[in-house]
Amino acid sequence: MIRQERSTSYQELSEELDQVVENSELADEQDKETVKVQGPGVLPGLDSESASSSIRFSKACLKNVFPVLLIFIYLLLMAVAVFLVYQTITDFREKLKHPVMSVSYKEVDRYDAPGIALYPGQAQLLSCKHHYEVIPPLTSPGQPGDMNCTTQRINYTDPFSNQTVKSALIVQGPREVKKRELVFLQFRLNKSSEDFSAIDYLLFSSFQEFLQSPNRVGFMQACESAYSSWKFSGGFRTWVKMSLVKTKEEDGREAVEFRQETSVVNYIDQRPAAEKSAQLFFVVFEWKDPFIQKVQDIITANPWNTIALLCGAFLALFKAAEFAKLSIKWMIKIRKRYLKRRGQATSHIS
């Protein structure tokens, strides 16, 4: 198609050029005939000669100025095409170096039950129960209560210090986010030699993976190395609202991260004075919302769009160069014709 368009454009331009040349030759023949009719001894008048020369001069100027303007326009188009190619390549490289972070949300009806790893130390677990929406009032705080949670105990070596053995209580977390399921735990610490009392905990994505893991010690060491740990203090009810964030790494792996919002409420201790020496811990775990946040880096540079744009720019450059070359040839040919006619007219007048 491109070759056909070029051939047709060249044919049209050559036909116009031949027509211009034929018109100029016809004009010259008519001038010669008028001179012959007037006779060899009679010269044309000065007024008619000056008028015809001025008309020819104006036509020659127009014929010379038009190709120059056309070449200037083609050069301007070539400069714009070169700048467009450079800018396209630069933008493509910048987009490859700096991908854009994309955040999307996926709604779920229920979550996989997360694992809650608690490190109570000397504290004793008094009760653990699943509730929905609300927590009933405490009947006997500080005393053992219902234990309807799935729990596992495991001892493993601290991955950051090989000389420390840690004892973890693994509790199955809530699942039914639409029903606002929550897990309420109560601990009691009788005596402590420390100035401040707190229990550490960490969250990992799936309690079922922990149960099915053939190496639970290695699983917990990997979780402690990958996830952050938090604390909740005694004498308060700490409400933890969890949210799940999945991040896609560059190598294609998917990393899971827990984000949480905590609210702390003071516990009004109404126990007898003899029992107040024991510190009580209350903690609630609940899902914040049914949306999983997915984060990944997206490269916005589209190679096909860039290739198409570059092809169009190079095609424009090629067409501009071809038209400029043809215009220069046409201008040179017209100039030669004009000089030839001028020489013939001068020799004829002389």
Curated annotation (Swiss-Prot):
Belongs to the proton-activated chloride channel family. Residues 86-301 are extracellular. GO terms for biological process: chloride transport. The modification Phosphoserine is found at S9, S14, S24. InterPro entries: TMEM206. Glycans are attached at N155, N162. Keywords: Cell membrane, Chloride, Chloride channel, Glycoprotein, Ion channel, Ion transport, Membrane, Phosphoprotein, Transmembrane, Transmembrane helix, Transport. It is found in: Cell membrane. Pfam families: TMEM206. Residues 1-64, 319-350 are cytoplasmic. Chloride channel gated by pH that facilitates the entry of chloride ions into cells upon exposure to extracellular acidic pH. Involved in acidosis-induced cell death by mediating chloride influx and subsequent cell swelling. The modification Phosphotyrosine is found at Y10. It catalyses: chloride(in) = chloride(out). One of its GO terms (molecular function) is pH-gated chloride channel activity. The chain crosses the membrane at residues 65-85, 302-318. Its main location: membrane. One of its GO terms (cellular component) is plasma membrane. This is Proton-activated chloride channel. The gene is PACC1. It is a multi-pass membrane protein.
